[in-house]
Amino acid sequence: WLSGKEGHVWRLRDGQLVEVARLAVSIEGERGIHSIAIDPQFTENRHVWIYYTTASPQVRNRLARFRSVGDQLVDETLILETPDLLGEFHHGGCIRFAPDGTIFLSTGDDLQNSSTSQNPDDIRGKMLHINRDGSPAAGNPYLAGGGDPRVWAIGLRNPWRFSLQPESE
């Protein structure tokens, strides 16, 4: 699987790249497709997850789940969306699955300095930890209040990539 900033999503089939989707995205600055992740249970559910910037009139970053059918991505399901974007830079954006099947998603601060990243009620400039339906994952620090319950860490400027360390002794 491969994605391009301009909205293209390809799959390698029989040694050839086959376009399976072309999303309507905003590509100004650092906008576009930010991350793609193949579901760990892909052989059973055929799910592909994409974090991207939507096109006008409401330009937002969106995490969506698609289903792979043949050589197409279909059935887009909205999982979460940021507020309207003000800047063209600092959108971050990386999707990783935890061993328990939950999702970690990094989001940039939309070049709004600390007004978004330090605000625990705003999902921009954060590390989010969610269930597959977009609900907050167990153990998040704001589950009892004081911020958006999907937030796992605050104060991130432009976290465009990260890794999860496998369990070790």
Predicted regions and their residues:
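Beta-propeller blade signature
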Residues: 62-71, 118-133
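Acidic, Gly/Ser/Thr-rich repeat motifs that build Ca2+-stabilized beta-propeller blades
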Residues: 1-114, 161-169
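Blade/loop signatures of beta-propeller domains
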Residues: 13, 69-73, 133-145
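Short, well-ordered junction/capping motifs at the entry into regular secondary structure
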Residues: 111-112, 143-151
